[in-house]
């Protein structure tokens, strides 16, 4: 599992706190201090994974709470999909701002799929975008398993 965090603050991230007890969740932190855009950090992580012959790469925002990270669940999904995410769109119109749900036609378009919970460890609300799992053309970068 690779995520980007400020140097010296990686253990303060929500992701670190919620996965440190999970022996399956090996973490590698790119300490970019918000000086590089996330897509550059993700590309750097992909290059690293290729060089190190990493079997599975999970790219995730550092503010994510993984309540049920499961290698078995990923194994099952990898039988059907090459890349796994929690939300995405079946159609895309590239434009600014480059937000997946806006480029996918917004809510009610029928193009958005998946679900994401927002909130904190005490209170959460679920945003369900549509049917999932579903083959899509663009994924939200909040969680990507390759």
Name what the model sees in each region.
Residues 35, 65-110:
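Conserved donor NDP-sugar-binding/catalytic core segment of glycosyltransferases
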Residues 8-23:
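Short, well-formed alpha-helical segments that are part of the catalytic scaffolds
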Residues 1-4, 26-29:
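Hydrophobic targeting segments
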Residues 43-56:
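Active-site nucleotide-sugar/metal-binding loop of Leloir-type enzymes
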Residues 54-65:
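Short beta-strand-to-loop acidic/aromatic patch adjacent to the donor-nucleotide binding site
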Residues 121-146:
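A recurrent flexible, glycine/aromatic-enriched loop bordering the glycosyltransferase active site
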Residues 7, 32, 62:
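Acidic ATP/Mg2+-coordinating residue in the GHKL
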Residues 32-38:
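Short, acidic/glycine-rich phosphate-metal binding loop used to engage nucleotide
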């Amino acid at each position: 599992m690779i995520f980007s965090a400020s140097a010296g603050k990686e253990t303060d991230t929500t992701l670190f706190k919620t996965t440190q007890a999970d022996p399956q969740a090996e973490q590698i932190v790119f300490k970019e201090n918000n000086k590089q855009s996330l897509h550059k950090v993700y590309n750097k992580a992909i290059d690293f994974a290729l060089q190190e012959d990493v079997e599975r790469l999970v790219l995730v925002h550092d503010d994510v709470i993984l309540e049920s990270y499961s290698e078995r669940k990923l194994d099952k999904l990898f039988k059907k999909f090459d890349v796994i995410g929690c939300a995405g769109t079946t159609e895309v119109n590239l434009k600014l701002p480059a937000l997946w749900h806006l480029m996918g036609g917004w809510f009610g378009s029928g193009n958005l799929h998946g679900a994401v919970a927002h909130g904190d460890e005490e209170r959460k609300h679920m945003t369900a975008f549509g049917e999932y799992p579903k083959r899509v053309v663009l994924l939200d970068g909040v969680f990507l398993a390759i």
